[in-house]
Amino acid sequence: MKRLARSLYLQVLLAVVLGALVGHLFPATGASLKPLGDGFIKLVKMLIAPIVFATVVTGIAKMGDLRKVGRVGLKGLLYFEVLTTVALAIGLVVARLARPGAGMNVDPATLDTKAIASYTNGAQAHGTVDFLMNVIPRDVADAFARGDILQVLLFSVLFGAALAALKDKGRPVLEFVDGLSLVLFRIVGFVMRLAPVGAFGAMAFTVGKYGIATLLSLGKLIACFYATSALFVVLMLGLVLRWCGLSLFRFLRYIKEEIFVVLGTSSSESALPLMMRKMEKLGCSKPVVGLVVPMGYSFNLDGTSIYLTLATLFIAQATNTHVTLVQELEILAVLLLTSKGAAAVTGGGFITLAATLSAVGNIPVAGLALLLGVDRFMSEARAITNLIGNGVASVAVSRWEGELDQARARAVLAGTVPDEVEPANDPEPPAMAAGLGLHG
C-alpha cells in the first residue's frame, strides 16, 4: 500500500483497470464520467503553452548561438520526416499483407454518415496551406489562449533570440522567465496528482460509451494496429536508441508514468510537460528538448502515421474498392502532407484521415463510419507511440548535435542516478537545472 501511495504509474494503472470495469458493468455511469478525463486534460493543456515558452526562451537565451537554434530545428524536421515516412510505409505494408478489411463486403451507400459529419466538415477546414499559415499567430495572446503549440513555439524562438541578442541588458527578463519556469513545474506536480482521477474517468467513458462488443467486431484491425505500433517501437525506435548507446526497454521503464497517463487519457499531449522534464533529466540538451518535443507534437506523430495508412487501406478493402500500387503511393504522398496537420489530441488522427480520404477521392469517405466505434480504442496505441517517438527524437537530435550526456543517460536508465521523478518533491525543475548546468 505504501508503494501504491508513492507510485504515480501504479495509481494510474489501477485507475485504468477500475475505469474499464465501471464502464463495462455500469455503461451509463461510465459514460457520465467523461468530465473527469476532460477536466484533467484541460488542466494539463492550461500549462503547456507557458511551459513551452519558458523552456524554449531560457534554452535559446542561455545558448546564445542563433545559428545553432536553426541547425537544431532543421535536424529535428529532417528526423521527423524520415521517421514518419517509415511509419506511413510500415502501415501501408502491414495493411497489404494482413488485409484486415478483406471479406467485409460493405456497401458505402448503406453506411450512416451523420455521425462522421463533424469530422469531415472539420477536415475540409484543415488544408496544407491553412496549416502552414496557421503557424503565424494573429496575435500572441490568442496563441497562448488557444494553446497552439506551433504558434507559441514560433513566438518563443523569436523572444529567446531577441533576449540572447540583448545579452546583459536582457538578464532581468531571463531571470524572471527562469523563476516562472520553477513555478510552472511546481504546478505540474500538483496537477499530476490528479492523473489517476482523469485516467479513471476517461477509461470509464470509453468503455461505457462504446462497449467491449465494439472492440470484438473489428478485432483484426485493432490487433494489426497494436502489433504494428509495437513493432515500430521495438525495431525502429529501438534502433535509434541503440545508435544513441541506450536501451529501449530501460528507456520505456524510465517513462512508464507518462505512458500510463497517456494510456488513461488517450492523448499524448497530456504528458508533454512531464516528458520535457524527463528528457532534460535524462541528459538531453535543454535547447534540443525545448525545440524538438513541442515540434514533434505536430510533425512527429509516428503512431498516427501508422494508423492513417492502415485505416485508409482497411476502408478500401472493407468497401471492395480496388487500389493499385500507384494509388497507394499517391496515398502515401498525400499523407506525408496531411499527417503533419494531425494534432496530438484525442480525435486528431480521425480528422486527418477524413481529410486524406477527401483528397485521394477514390476511397469512399463514408467508410469512416466503420471506424467511428473503434477509433477511440486505437487512440491509446496512437498516443503512446507518439509519446515514445517524441522522447526518442529528443535523444536522437541531442546525440546528433553531440550534446547528449550518454554517461548520465545510461546511469539514469540503470537507476544508479536519481531522476527525481516526483514533480511535487522536486525543488528545482529542469528548465532551471539545465540552464545552470546542474545535470551532473
From Swiss-Prot:
Source species, domain of life: Bacteria
MF-aspect GO terms: fumarate transmembrane transporter activity; malate:proton symporter activity; succinate transmembrane transporter activity
GO CC annotations, alphabetized: plasma membrane
A single BP term in Gene Ontology: L-aspartate transmembrane transport
Localization (cell): Cell inner membrane
Keyword Protease: no
Membrane topology designation: Multi-pass membrane protein
Record keywords, A-Z: Cell inner membrane, Cell membrane, Membrane, Symport, Transmembrane, Transmembrane helix, Transport
Membrane-crossing residue ranges in chain numbering: 8-28, 40-60, 74-94, 147-167, 187-207, 221-241, 288-308, 354-374
UniProt region (Disordered), positions on chain: 419-440
Function in brief: Responsible for the transport of dicarboxylates such as succinate, fumarate, and malate from the periplasm across the membrane.
Family classification: Belongs to the dicarboxylate/amino acid:cation symporter (DAACS) (TC 2.A.23) family.
Full protein name: C4-dicarboxylate transport protein
Gene field: dctA
